[in-house]
Amino acid sequence: MAQLQTARLGEKRVIELYERYGPETIGACLSTYLHQAEVRMRNAITALPDGVYFAEDYLENSGTNPDPVVVRCKTEIHGDTMNVDFTGTSPQVAGPTNTPYTCSLCGVFNVLKTFLDPGVLMNSGGWRPINVEIPEGTTLNPTWPAPVCGVSDIMFGPVQGCMLAVLGQLIPDLLSATLRSGANQVNASGTDPTKGNALWHLF
């Protein structure tokens, strides 16, 4: 309930701003914020040496299969742009450890913002110089009906681990150890009494 009320208050404040300053002024301010974030991130990327960098991390298993779930990352830096490619990452799994595409993107940007320029405004402008490729059907970009109950709690770790490994080749003196390499979870399983389907939920 507190989160809902916070969102409603935020909505009210935004409406008040539009009523006070008008859409043109608000739009110009938003464009400026986006541009500022883009410029700062481009400057941060420019300070890194051009090249191609590789990293790999993994989850020990998916919960339903003992095989490791691999996350592979190829990062290319050219001037003020960066391309992050997760081709080679394991296909989506039957266990609840897949992560939706948007959560995987957050894992990439979280690390880049933290270590390249923590002062970059949190908006999409900072994304403009960064292209992220995540093949559909992988554990980082699954398709229906792949379970994604773990979302950012589980595969977020290997995504961040890959990005930290890449930055470790570029700015090792600025890095910490991995931010997280997994999470402790509670699993609940059973049968849906209305449909008879097997259920497995991860908390």
Q: Which functions belong to the PLM regions below?
A:
Residues 1-203:
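Glycine/proline-enriched, intrinsically flexible loops and inter-domain linkers
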